[in-house]
Amino acid sequence: MIQIGRPYIEQADKNFRLTADVVMDQETKKWWFEVPAEYKQYLCTERSDAFLIGILPLAMRFGEDISLDAPVTEELLFNIETELIPSLVNSSKNLYASRIFAETETEIINEGAWGVGTGNSMGVDSFYAIEMSLHNHCKSYHLTHLCHYNVGAFNDTYSTAGEDEVREICLRNAKQVAEENGLPMLISNSNYEEIVDINHLFVNTYANLYAVYCLQKLWKTYYLASSEFGFHRFQLEDNDMYDSAHYDLLTVNCLSTRGLK
């Protein structure tokens, strides 16, 4: 059983962290997501949504159930239990149908949320999402923020090249892109990869959506850029052996709610 305590906010120098105490294998760890002070008000302590999304692939891969002290959004839990978990388990060789123990809430926690965001990783997929949003004629879907979430991609993907150096270069270029488009650049940090110690390819979708839900009081819409894996390449069979982006169309649908799409 993985036990996740009620989220709370801690200060870390000039930044603030959304933190939860996690008990796994009889060891307690602090799991945190850090943002600059101006985003503190958007960190969500009232729900466990972010931490459930983030821990789910680990629990399913290692046969663990999940207990959460803070409530979960009822719509989100319903989608996970009735659609996401059965679909993944039935199309894999090794995944476990984790049981989730949590109270639920039906109230929309981010009523009045106004943010529209997407990642700014400097990849072709994120550039497409930025271009599509900025020039769409539907103005309520125009971007308000570009984001850089440090949730494990650099540590796995660029470990041989030097993750700190590569991240610094990407950040510098990403800030320039944000400035050229007149958008704020939201830069966060997390110890996600220390808690969910799995190859990032298997969890990248969950890692990014964990970050999104940590700030769910900000977002009404978030674009998850997913290169190459549209309807024509959707793949669920043996999903535990492949990049989680292969089934983003399922994951993103199941992990959307009335308050956050």
Predicted regions and their residues:
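Nucleotide-activated chemistry modules centered on ATP-dependent adenylation/adenylyltransferase
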Residues: 1-23, 45, 50, 54, ...
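N-terminal, positively charged, Ser/Thr/Ala/Gly-biased leader segments
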Residues: 23-45
